[in-house]
Design a protein with these regions (language model features):
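The feature marks the first
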Residues: 44-82
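Bacterial N-terminal signal peptides
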Residues: 17-28
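Surface-exposed, polar helix/loop patches in the mature regions of secreted/periplasmic/lumenal proteins
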Residues: 96-143, 147
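Disulfide-stabilized extracellular ectodomain repeats and their linkers
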Residues: 43-46, 62, 70, 94, ...
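Sequence/structural segment immediately N-terminal to covalent heme-attachment motifs in c-type
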Residues: 33-55, 126-150
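An amphipathic alpha-helix signature
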Residues: 70, 74-82, 105-112, 116, ...
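Axial heme c-ligation environment in periplasmic c-type cytochrome domains
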Residues: 58-64, 80-108, 124-129, 153-159, ...
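N-terminal secretory signal peptides that target proteins for export/translocation
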Residues: 1-15
Length: 218
């Protein structure tokens, strides 16, 4: 079934699958129904992977949702549903997310509103890097995400400060490698893919994330 994937992607996906298969098994028992029949969304959906407090789970590469902008969360759920995100065979965490995002518009609206009610606290710092070097590299990022990394809705750029740093490292690495942002319908992802050219290696990625960590989260 996974023979279309490169060997290293298959290995990574299987490792990830052993952690999330129990979650997927539970979710198979929970139908996504129409608006008249839906039940309130609770830990059966998002919190099983993203945490009961919405702060994320590094072990299964599930980022924090608490504090995420409603418009950005909506866009990502819609992208997963449309196959715009999580389509690349090397984006193993994205592939794992796609079955979880087969939602109606009303379901997405419910989830976005529910997540928006969670308390927000900045994520713990787990990534080390050269903050001074990262500050220089972040100049390109600031064009869209702002000098304070608090995001810019008009640019479609989410806040970076306060997000799980391991998640930022993973996603920047995916953009650099071409695993994310290459779908022809991913307008904002394509913009990101074009902007990460200055991040030439893992050290540069960690440096810029270390600088983001040094900024005050909202």
């Amino acid at each position: 079934m996974l023979n279309f994937l490169p060997l290293d992607a298959r290995h990574k996906l299987w490792r990830l699958a052993t952690r999330i298969l129990p979650v997927l098994a539970v979710c198979q028992l929970i139908p996504f129904t129409d608006a008249a029949e839906r039940e309130p969304y609770d830990d059966r959906y998002c919190t099983t992977c993203h945490g009961t407090d919405g702060r994320g789970n590094e072990g299964i590469e599930a980022p924090r949702l608490a504090g995420m902008e409603d418009w950005y969360l909506r866009r990502q759920l819609e992208n997963f549903r449309a196959g715009i995100r999580g389509y690349h065979p090397m984006d193993t965490a994205g592939i794992a997310m796609r079955p979880m995002a087969k939602l109606t518009d009303d379901s997405i609206a419910d989830i976005v509103a529910w997540v928006g009610s969670w308390d927000y606290q900045p994520a713990e710092i787990t990534t080390e890097g050269d903050v001074q070097s990262g500050e220089l590299l972040y100049g390109v990022c600031a064009t869209c995400h702002g000098m304070d990394a608090k995001g810019n809705a008009a640019m479609g750029a989410p806040a970076l400060a306060g997000q799980n740093d391991w998640y930022l490292v993973t996603q920047l690495s995916n953009f650099v490698a071409g695993y994310r942002g290459r779908h022809e319908d991913d307008r904002y992802g394509q913009q990101m893919a074009a902007m990460v050219g200055t991040l030439t290696d893992e050290s540069a990625i960690r440096d810029v994330v270390a600088y983001i960590n040094s900024l005050e989260a909202r």
